[in-house]
UniProtKB/Swiss-Prot annotation:
Binds 1 Fe(2+) ion per subunit. Its cofactor is Fe(2+). GO terms for cellular component: cytoplasm. It comes from Syntrophomonas wolfei subsp. wolfei (strain DSM 2245B / Goettingen). It holds the Pfam family TsaD. Signal peptide: none annotated. This is tRNA N6-adenosine threonylcarbamoyltransferase.
Length: 339
């Protein structure tokens, strides 16, 4: 494998409700990173409405890309390639980014690069950390996915385990909804948890006693819902304690599974990625446990944990080095296909 060290790549991200474009040099230096969020629009619905998200992407994509070039002070022709998230995500939303990227690449006669959204989250770490040692365990936690991977090097990864039902971020959203905390659920539960105390209630640590690296958060969500309904009937419901206990139960499983994976595969590095990696309780407990185990820990800054296009361009740098280009017939896929 020959890795080209020099690249200037436009990244485009429209997998959910952020319209994003960024220009990154050599997979590490962010020249621009524009994100147009739709959170305010979808809050009134209690979650992302796919049709609305797609229409807003159509309205925003051209302007967001133009702003990325303007902020980077570059002409369109200066880039070496166009990269776009084409899986997984909301298919209508993905199609907006993919269609724009294909047309843009064709017009500029530049190569097109397809990026897996979850790979993008992982490579957000490379934008801010230069000393990541491999092999590494990577915990990817987002609204739609929860996976534990073994990365042998920046170009090779193996899935060790995934969620069998709800993703961590999805569980946060659903629990926040029935607690009346609003959307998005992760930040809402994190805020409520600061006013409560974990341990006042007892929620299960699902799959924690298993020797594999699978996850399941549907049972935790259901247990929280059942306890909440009982407490409400008794007039003993405390939303802050419930938020704290739910967050603690979910975070403990994520952290301990990661530590066990590092021990089994004799790895000295753990990376975290994805929107849920912004959770402060997760960061704090992972810091504590990796320090106790003598492991190195890496995670992106808060602005790079959530969906953005800089991470897409960062991942695309490695595809560019391998000359792994996509045809102009590239399609969008809602499912992961293969990680």
């Amino acid at each position: 494998m020959v890795l080209v060290q020099e690249s200037l790549i436009l990244g485009i991200e429209t997998s959910c409700d952020e319209t994003a474009a960024a220009i990154v040099r050599n997979g590490k230096e962010i020249l621009s990173n524009i994100v147009n969020s739709q959170i305010d629009i979808h809050q009134q619905f209690g979650g992302v409405v796919p049709e609305v998200a797609s229409r807003k992407h159509i309205e925003n994509i051209a302007g967001v890309v133009h702003r990325a070039f303007s902020e980077a002070q570059l002409a369109y022709s200066a880039i070496d390639a166009v990269a776009v998230t084409n899986r997984p995500g909301l298919v209508g939303a993905l199609l907006v980014g993919v269609s724009f990227a294909k047309a843009f690449a064709y017009a500029l006669e530049k190569p097109l690069i397809a990026v897996n959204h979850l790979h993008g989250h992982i490579y957000a770490n490379f934008l801010e950390h230069r000393d990541i040692e491999f092999p590494a365990i990577c915990l990817v936690v987002s609204g739609g996915h929860t996976s534990l991977l073994l990365m042998s090097n920046p170009n090779k990864m193996e899935v060790l385990g995934e969620t069998r039902d709800d993703a961590a971020g999805e569980a946060f959203d659903k629990v926040a909804r029935f607690l009346g905390l609003g959307y998005p659920g992760g930040p809402a539960i994190q805020e409520a948890a600061t006013k409560g105390k974990a341990g006042q209630l007892q929620l299960p640590r699902v799959f924690l006693d298993r020797n594999d690296f699978e996850f399941s958060f549907s049972g935790l969500k259901t247990a929280a819902m059942n306890q909440w309904n009982k407490l409400q009937r008794r007039g003993q419901a405390n939303v802050f304690d419930m938020a704290a206990e739910f967050q603690a139960a979910l975070v403990e499983v994520l952290v301990e599974k990661s530590i066990k994976a590092a021990a089994k595969y004799q790895v000295r590095t753990i990376m975290m990625a994805g929107g849920v990696a912004a959770n402060q309780e997760l960061r704090n407990l992972m810091k504590k446990r990796t320090k106790e185990a003598g492991l190195k820990l890496f995670y992106p800054s808060l602005k790079l944990c959530t969906d953005n296009a800089a991470m897409v361009a960062a991942n695309a740098h490695y595809h560019y080095g391998n000359r792994s280009f996509a045809p102009l017939s590239l399609n969008a896929y809602p499912s992961l296909l293969s990680l």
